[in-house]
Swiss-Prot record:
Entry function: Component of the sulfite reductase complex that catalyzes the 6-electron reduction of sulfite to sulfide. This is one of several activities required for the biosynthesis of L-cysteine from sulfate. The flavoprotein component catalyzes the electron flow from NADPH -> FAD -> FMN to the hemoprotein component.
Name listed for the protein in its UniProt record: Sulfite reductase [NADPH] flavoprotein alpha-component
Record family assignment: Belongs to the NADPH-dependent sulphite reductase flavoprotein subunit CysJ family. In the N-terminal section; belongs to the flavodoxin family.
Co-factor requirement: FAD; FMN
InterPro entries given in the database record: CysJ, CysJ-like_FAD-binding, CysJ_Proteobact, FAD-bd_FR_type, Flavdoxin-like, Flavodoxin/NO_synth, Flavoprot_Pyr_Nucl_cyt_Rdtase, Flavoprotein-like_sf
Complex and partners: Alpha(8)-beta(8). The alpha component is a flavoprotein, the beta component is a hemoprotein.
């Protein structure tokens, strides 16, 4: 796009400022330019002089608020795309992350859109927990003047599919809100459903909200944008694996790898707290086994995203083979009329249990059938990348990114099975081999801005990963704030991940305290939550001193047990009852002093 620049004498910018402005906007799309224009208009109108000079609008325009509640970035992408659609339609829209939303203002919302994912056992994303609690509390206001719509993202391989969206949708209606549209529940392959839903939302809102004047069509309150980079989930960087080191002992029941990936001169940047997305390939041996069980050859042509590929290639690169789902089991049973599987159809609990305990290849082995190649790929879900908490800081490792990978290995009736991405990194990528990666930024898991703030890190197992990044960053920054680590695993001698590094940080005074829980080294099992209770008095002192608390690891059990221990510590040493302790912890969450990266 070429813009005719007025003579410099007529501009309020000097040549250097003009050059910087042109350089910054050269590659922007029309939608992005519109957003930038609106952003500067918003900045201008925050100035007192500008406020005084701005005439009052003739009539108040009802604003549209989009709340993004995202765990891995997908919900945020949908929310941002909807925001752009509404701006293009010249509607007044505000996009805000659930974690930044002042939820007590929800009663004043006229048009409210919620885009949410689900984590754990049907729980809302971390950034939406406080909002969810508020809406389900006695403090929630009536919403008779609010019209709303909900788009819910989930994974049908989990029992509580899209539960967070279902919760928000039902509660907003219960509080008196009017549904603009019926809720949409989208599976892993959500893009088509999201595109259709966005179009319907725009049409519905056009009749509700008048078209804005140019100065009103502004995307205000936009936070936690997908960071600008030439590399993304859909356009990953082809990097190289430089280190693959087993960091559990020879006799450990766990196979945990320290993986280092060379980013080269890509310029890819990340921060402690971010995740690394890894696109993996299925094991060729697994592909071969599945193809042969179905009496196929593997060279049959199939269509994937408009391209014709041999079946073997399609299965290796494009379809999920290591995670079964209730839908796949049900569809396979119906398609093959399997006498073993048909009795499960219609029984959600039995389907979920079977899918959780029986990989796709073993389902086919136990209930053999003959499918053509197209029927097979229509049965499967698209392959999706896996996210790993980043275990390094670029202040220390520069053009590298490190992750801590727990390799999933198990047997099904004597046959070795493994996780798709973890075994890809551990077993099938050779040194200097190619790995397609991208950064998934997570602004809801960040070190305190003030380097003097104390930090409490709770990360058993591979949950230790982001805290290695945190400590590298705190050491590089020479941050004077105290640091306290709680770590746990089965055995001290076999499972003390990054032991030498933690001991060095303690010796250097960077790590102020470390408490370790070894669950199998004594008769009575000890976990990190037990250590929290044991150190309750000191923990409360740190919290009173303004400490930020971070939890990383398993969402289903560990995170809940840790939160219960924190509530007990707060109640006992803070002199609160259960309800007050819960409110206190919720306030810490709202203040970003209690952050979790759980999965």
């Amino acid at each position: 796009m070429t813009t005719q620049v007025p003579p410099s004498a007529l501009l309020p910018l000097n040549p250097e400022q003009l050059a910087r402005l042109q350089a910054a906007t050269t590659d922007l799309t029309p939608t992005q330019l519109a957003w930038v224009s609106g952003y500067f208009w918003g900045v201008l109108n925050q100035q007192p002089a500008a406020l005084a000079a701005t005439p009052a609008p003739a009539a108040e325009m009802p604003g549209i608020t989009i709340i993004s509640a995202s765990q891995t970035g997908n919900a945020r992408r949908v929310a941002e795309a909807l925001r752009d659609d509404l701006l293009t339609a010249k509607l007044n829209v505000k996009l805000v992350n659930a974690g930044d939303y002042k939820f007590k203002q929800i009663a004043s919302e006229k048009l409210l859109i919620v885009v949410t994912s689900t984590q754990g056992e049907g729980e809302p994303p971390e950034e939406a927990v406080a909002l969810h609690k508020f809406l389900f509390s006695k403090k929630a206001p009536k919403l008779e003047n609010t019209a709303f719509a909900v788009f819910s993202l989930g994974d049908s391989s989990y029992e509580f599919f899209c539960q967070s969206g279902k919760d928000f949708d039902s509660k907003l209606a219960e509080l008196g809100g009017e549904r603009l549209l019926d809720r949409v529940d989208a599976d892993v392959e959500y893009q088509a459903a999201a595109s259709e839903w966005r179009a319907r939302v725009v049409d519905a809102l056009k009749s509700r909200a008048p078209v804005a004047a140019p100065s009103q069509s502004v995307a205000t309150g936009v936070v936690n944008e997908i960071h600008t980079s030439p590399y993304s989930k859909d356009a990953p960087l082809v990097a190289s694996l430089s280190v693959n080191q087993k960091i559990t002992g020879r006799n450990s029941e766990k196979d945990v790898r320290h993986i280092e990936i060379d980013l080269g001169d890509s310029g890819l940047r990340y921060q402690p707290g971010d995740a690394l997305g890894v696109w993996y390939q299925n094991d060729p041996a697994l592909v071969k086994e599945l193809v042969e069980l179905l009496w196929l050859k593997g060279d049959e042509p199939v269509t994937v995203e408009g391209k014709t590929l041999p079946l073997n290639e399609a299965l290796q690169w494009h379809f999920e083979l290591t995670v079964n789902t209730a839908n796949i089991v049900e569809n396979y049973a119906t398609l093959t009329r399997s006498e073993t599987l048909l009795p499960l159809v219609g029984d959600k609990a039995k389907l979920q249990h079977y899918a959780a305990t029986t990989p796709i290849v073993d389902m086919v082995r136990f209930s053999p059938a003959q499918l053509d190649a197209e029927a097979l790929i229509n049965l499967l879900r698209p392959l999706t990348p896996r996210l790993y908490s980043i275990a390094s800081s670029q202040e220390e490792v520069e053009n590298e990114v490190h992750v801590t990978v727990g390799v999933v290995r198990y047997d099904v009736e004597g046959r070795a099975r493994a996780g798709g991405a973890s075994s890809f990194l551990a077993d099938r990528v050779e040194e200097e081999g190619e790995v397609r990666v991208f950064i998934e930024h997570n602004d809801n898991f960040r070190l305190p801005a003030n380097p003097e703030t104390p930090v409490i890190m709770i990360g058993p197992g591979t949950g230790i990963a982001p805290f290695r990044a945190f400590m590298q960053q705190r050491a590089a920054d020479e941050a004077p704030g105290k640091n306290w680590l709680f770590f746990g695993n089965p055995h001290f001698t076999e499972d003390f991940l990054y032991q030498v590094e933690w001991q060095r940080y303690v010796k250097e005074g960077v790590l102020t305290r470390i408490d370790l829980a070894w669950s199998r080294d004594q008769k009575e099992k000890v976990y990190v939550q037990d250590k929290l209770r044991e150190q309750g008095a000191e923990l409360w002192r740190w919290i009173n001193d303004g400490a930020h608390i971070y939890v990383c690891g398993d969402a289903n059990r560990m995170a809940k047990d840790v939160e219960q221990a924190l509530l007990e510590v707060i109640a006992e040493f803070g002199g609160m009852d259960t309800e007050a302790a819960d409110e206190f912890l919720s306030e810490l969450r709202v203040e970003r002093r209690y952050q979790r990266d759980v999965y």
